[in-house]
């Protein structure tokens, strides 16, 4: 059973395949640089996926898990800084769509 109480599922749409690849690499660098900040703020886990079942879509999925609502709020502050750094560093235009939820139950099949 995970310690996560809240999750965010964020999709990021890109205009070109190159933008998506560069965006993935640069975002990972920024996230790694901020690893300790996110951990201290209460982030539990991050998973990044490339969406493959939407024809013509250049989309990444970001699943974030948080230990509680306070952790979510604190991590949002770090995200704002990270998004600004990403924009300034890459100039890539991306559309971001966020979905958030409270964990009702969690099943681990391993």
What are these language model-derived features?
Residues 10-15, 69, 101-110:
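Short flexible/disordered coil segments
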């Amino acid at each position: 059973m995970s310690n996560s109480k809240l999750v965010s599922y964020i999709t990021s749409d890109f205009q070109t395949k190159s933008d998506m690849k560069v965006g993935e690499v640069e975002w990972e660098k920024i996230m790694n640089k901020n690893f300790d900040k996110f951990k201290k703020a209460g982030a539990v886990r991050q998973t990044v996926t490339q969406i493959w079942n939407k024809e013509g879509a250049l989309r990444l999925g970001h699943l974030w898990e948080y230990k509680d609502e306070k952790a979510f709020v604190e991590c949002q502050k770090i995200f704002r800084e990270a998004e600004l750094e990403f924009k300034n560093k890459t100039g890539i235009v991306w559309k971001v769509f966020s979905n958030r939820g409270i964990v009702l139950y969690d099943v681990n099949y391993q």
